[in-house]
């Protein structure tokens, strides 16, 4: 999971692994959890990593964080402009680190899912509009790196729309892993 500091990554991470909102503290190191998710009547094991605030110290996470990744979750706070503006930075870092880890070209890059967090907070004039989010997705799709940006809005506080993005993430990761295995 990638995104700016305080963009809601840890709250989503904790919800998906069964820790309820507000009942946990932020870890001081990277957080990792293994979760089994049902996809097409098949139980799929997922390794989920959270940067746990390390991105506030550097936007250049160690390339080992990206090793053997099959999908990326990009998160931004629906109410914080900088976290939305920095999505390109996070996506570029993800792509460059994957290439550094041995992927041969851009066509082999793992897919990603975009999550807008804190959807429980009412939208205001300073919030990121749906139109801007749709435009960002179209721009990414237009670059030819990815066919479709899967976008979800979630609220960890209310446990809303947490499962659906991870079902999509798991399906994308499984498809990607299978296609990479065929190439190797």
Curated annotation (Swiss-Prot):
Keywords: GTP-binding, Nucleotide-binding. One of its GO terms (biological process) is phagosome-lysosome fusion. It holds the Pfam family Ras. The keyword Nucleotide-binding applies. GO terms for cellular component: late endosome; lysosome; phagocytic vesicle. One of its GO terms (molecular function) is GTPase activity. A motif (Effector region) lies at residues 25-32. GTP binds at residues 3-10, 50-54, 117-120. Belongs to the small GTPase superfamily. Rab family. This is Ras-related protein RabN2. It comes from Dictyostelium discoideum (Social amoeba). The gene is rabN2.
